[in-house]
């Protein structure tokens, strides 16, 4: 290996290391904010009347959610644990495979936010056997949710937008390797 190749390899490793450090710090910050808001909900909302922020639109209401979104799959902690670990594994695989260039920065950021939301609710499930929800958008009688749910929802919507309007087949080839003309 010549000197130029060694320098390029070292620069690539340094860049990857920087991205990993940024991702860890960003996840820690987002996760910290999620957990802090849930702590505030426990302290100021549990066993207390709702706090109306905008009459008829937005309230803070404490809820211990033992299910998934919209209250489905109540008390299925083992299923949530398996799905979360699987989901995080896929997220970190994609994160690892995405080229560390400005072209793929949106997907890099989305997976940071996605992982933060998944880990935030996972921590609650492991620690308390339920997730603390506290944001109630009652204008449309939407289910009560939390900051981690916002992270997850925005990430999924953004992924669909990126898939539909930003990234093309060449991008997927770049991330996951060449595919045949059949897409296999």
Q: What positions do the PLM features span?
A:
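Alpha-helical transmembrane bundles and membrane-interface segments of multipass inner-membrane proteins
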Residues: 2-184
């Amino acid at each position: 290996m010549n000197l130029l190749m060694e320098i390029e390899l070292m620069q690539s490793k340094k860049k990857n290391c920087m991205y990993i450090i940024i991702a860890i710090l960003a996840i820690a910050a987002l996760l910290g904010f999620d957990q802090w808001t849930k702590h505030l909900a426990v302290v100021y909302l549990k066993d207390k009347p709702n706090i109306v922020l905008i009459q008829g639109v937005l309230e803070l209401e404490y809820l211990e959610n033992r299910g998934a979104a919209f209250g489905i799959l109540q008390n299925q902690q083992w299923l949530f644990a398996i799905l979360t670990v699987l989901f995080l594994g896929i997220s970190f695989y994609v994160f690892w495979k995405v080229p560390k260039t400005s072209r793929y920065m949106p997907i890099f950021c989305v997976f940071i936010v996605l992982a933060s939301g998944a880990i935030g609710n996972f921590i609650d499930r492991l620690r308390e056997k339920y997730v603390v929800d506290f944001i109630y958008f009652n204008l449309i009688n939407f289910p009560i949710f939390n900051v981690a749910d916002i992270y997850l929802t925005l990430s999924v919507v953004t992924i669909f937008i990126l898939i539909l309007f930003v990234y093309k087949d060449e991008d997927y080839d770049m991330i996951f390797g060449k595919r045949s003309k059949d897409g296999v």
